Design a protein with these regions (language model features):
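Conserved alpha/beta cores of soluble small-molecule-handling proteins
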Residues: 1-91
Length: 91
């Protein structure tokens, strides 16, 4: 599942700065029984990473709801990737 600004999409634009330049952050979470493990630790690290890159951190409540929805199948891994989005070429 791919969400862009909270909306599901089929693919990402190749001009996304996260894809082109690695301009973003990510967290990989383990889910068990439909719940992300160590959520508080992951969301704290995600917020700190966003602050370091001057990215807006996602709404925690909304993000947790999406993670739970994806993890509802039971056990697995959820990867959260936040990018700066579309932007001009260059660093």
């Amino acid at each position: 599942m791919i969400l862009v600004n909270g909306q599901p999409v089929e693919s990402l634009d190749v001009r996304d700065r996260g894809l082109a330049y690695g301009d973003g952050v990510f967290r990989t979470l383990r889910a068990q029984a439909g719940e992300p493990l160590w959520w508080r630790d992951h969301i704290a690290k995600l917020a700190a990473d966003c602050a370091a890159l001057l990215l807006d951190a996602p709404d925690e409540t909304g993000l947790l709801a999406e993670v739970r929805r994806v993890a509802a199948a039971g056990q697995g891994v959820v990867k959260i990737i936040l990018t700066r989005g579309l932007g001009a070429r260059g660093y």
